[in-house]
């Protein structure tokens, strides 16, 4: 079998103007970046207002395991399959971060014969959106220290500046640093640090903004720290939001590319799926809905994190109405949830699969809590046995959910046509989408609701200072905001080793953060790393350029 990058290089790509034409876009509606990438212009997006909307399909998954689930691959394969059965469908996914690409994750454009191209560009600099986010974020950081240096009229307390710097690379030594050493000319020394760009609130804002005006307003609401008398200081107080918006003006325009089967794909934005909402941009999703019958999108990690945030944060804030959910599962991952070691996953083990299906069952139940019809996509691996596939299908049938075997990795859209027909049937049957909690529910109660109803926790543990902080934000007018849970993606609990469907555990809320610009409150449960480090043998060791200038080892 050819590698992903070999398949991507052999793709018969169409000029991006033809892909835009399939969406009904004229030459003036997009800005080409070479022959195979483009940005859809602000003016073209504004002209789409009032158009009938297509149906929004969410692709999510069971809790991720090292065995792999193939969520992005399924998203792309489903988009191609919908087009094959006569529906105008567009795929919407996030952009890739350089850090994980050179660390240990690999690319983020699908796999096998269900990929988005140009794969190499997408996994490297693409159209420069992440550079723009990095620049806007660090401009604000520079303006904070510059303000303190030149007299500090706002009386910002250097000890309580919470705005860190960012870069799009994994570099553990930058997590905690001291800046402004070397004398008075270099500023006021203080502790600081770096996060990876996808952890920036600016990235979350870019992905939740509805237009340029909304982008600028959100940037102005960013809270960067406190004064000496504990009053919040915003980016607007520093006068930074205008210049930040200028840096992000082009980045706000969605990126148009294509699948291997020459169907349109909008790849835009990339917020962290733990301390942010982990979804592609509202601008891209709305644009696709106005230009397509069906829009297939995904949310980061498993349904307990990604789908919950997609539904409670993105859909709530953007007024989106999803029509159905596709829950991706693999025989291998379910056996792992049933207690099988990774090294033993190749052997048939129906009993372990049935035990691991408890994880799948809870995700099905949770998606139904939001009023969404669900179909399970069994992402096929060559080692899956007929008995294992039958047991998985039986489990789903007993719970009133259809399970569809998919072979899009090997066959492209053709291998997901049955899934596409099932999705169309579900979407045409209608959904009764409702967020899990109302806006007016107190912040602490929102956190408890997610922990009890989605995770299955028996208790939520708040440290005293966290309760005080939540009450303070509630009184300051932030109580209507949704909450963004930051915890391990590997388990329903805060313990990454607790696989399957644990119950009755305690979720410890260790820290809360106000993302006033993005428009949510982050609840951190356990240790969350916002600046990753490279592994002992990073992917970068295998990446290079051959004699013909072709990238080698990227994926």
Swiss-Prot record:
Pfam families: FTHFS. Gene3D superfamilies: Domain 2, N(10)-formyltetrahydrofolate synthetase, Formyltetrahydrofolate synthetase, domain 3, P-loop containing nucleotide triphosphate hydrolases. Keywords: ATP-binding, Ligase, Nucleotide-binding, One-carbon metabolism. Its EC number is 6.3.4.3. The keyword Cell wall biogenesis/degradation does not apply. CDD domains: FTHFS. It comes from the Bacteria. Pathway: One-carbon metabolism; tetrahydrofolate interconversion. Signal peptide: none annotated. ATP binds at residues 65-72. One of its GO terms (molecular function) is formate-tetrahydrofolate ligase activity. Belongs to the formate--tetrahydrofolate ligase family. This is Formate--tetrahydrofolate ligase. It comes from Paracoccus denitrificans (strain Pd 1222).
